[in-house]
Curated annotation (Swiss-Prot):
Quaternary structure and partners: Homodimer; disulfide-linked. Monomer. Interacts with APOA1.
Tissue: Highly expressed in lung and trachea. Detected throughout the airway epithelium in lung, with slightly higher expression in large airways. Found in lung submucosal gland acinus where it localizes to serous-like cells. Probably expressed in club cells of the bronchioles. Not detected in other tissues tested.
Name used for this protein in its record: Secretoglobin family 3A member 2
UniProt keyword Secreted, yes or no: yes
Family (UniProt): Belongs to the secretoglobin family. UGRP subfamily.
Top-level taxonomy: Eukaryota, Metazoa, Chordata, Craniata, Vertebrata
Location in the cell: Secreted
Domain of life: Eukaryota
Free-text function comment from the UniProt entry: Secreted cytokine-like protein. Binds to the scavenger receptor MARCO. Can also bind to pathogens including the Gram-positive bacterium L.monocytogenes, the Gram-negative bacterium P.aeruginosa, and yeast. Strongly inhibits phospholipase A2 (PLA2G1B) activity. Seems to have anti-inflammatory effects in respiratory epithelium. Also has anti-fibrotic activity in lung. May play a role in fetal lung development and maturation. Promotes branching morphogenesis during early stages of lung development.
InterPro entries according to UniProt: Secretoglobin_3A
Primary localisation category: secreted
Length: 93
């Protein structure tokens, strides 16, 4: 049950992170050229996934290690979804 809760929270965080990245890249070109914003410097500190995991007291390294163990025990359909999640989390380590 805890694993399902963590999986759902991580999935929601990844979706919100993707939505944030999508919206930031939609700045119109003339505005972007007139007033360049230092968003690249701010966003690493405001990473919602890292913030959520840190708030829950979960280390990313332990989560990645646990997901790798889960991938070895799952069936082919479920393992593909967990592999994608593991790939996304491994960028945070």
């Amino acid at each position: 049950m805890k694993l399902v809760t963590i999986f759902l929270l991580v999935t929601i965080s990844l979706c919100s992170y993707s939505a944030t990245a999508f919206l930031i890249n939609k700045v119109p070109l003339p505005v972007d050229k007139l007033a360049p914003l230092p968003l690249d410097n701010i966003l690493p500190f405001m990473d919602p996934l890292k913030l959520l995991l840190k708030t829950l007291g979960i280390s990313v390294e332990h989560l990645v290690e646990g997901l790798r163990k889960c991938v070895n025990e799952l069936g082919p359909e479920a393992s593909e979804a967990v592999k994608k999640l593991l790939e996304a989390l491994s960028h945070l380590v």
